Amino acid sequence: MVFNFFKKEKLKVVAPVNGAIIPLEEVPDPVFSQKMMGEGIAILPSEGNVYSPVDGTVILIASTKHAVGIRANDGTEILLHVGLETVALNGKGFRVGVNEGDKISVGQMIMEADWEYISKNAKSKIIPIVITNSEDKQFILTEEENAVQGKTVIITGS
């Protein structure tokens, strides 16, 4: 009989929003498309708020409320960057519902976003979801084209 006491669960990052899944290489911003911040995927949101894609701890909330960093329970660090050039909105269009240091669970609401305002006042409402410490591990990105918040696994880690 083999015991799996020490076998770690594989990381599963679920979609934080509903929308179209886009390869990171197609995000119209070189910081993301050239993977300067790490491996990942992007979602063009169709509706709704932004929810936690993993169980973990909030480690960063941008002062302009457009980005949230989460450390998953396995140590993987995930950045949700809501929109492109949204730092210039100075927090307008965003209401963050968590604080740095909060323990969060998959599916917990972390941000309300005014998609109409963001669409009119920023370059894009696309959400890059980046593993900022991806050099340490290997990840498998989904081949799905559409994301269902809380259900579609978009990134799997080893």
Residue locations for each model-derived region?
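Contiguous, well-folded functional domains in the mature portion of proteins
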Residues: 1-158
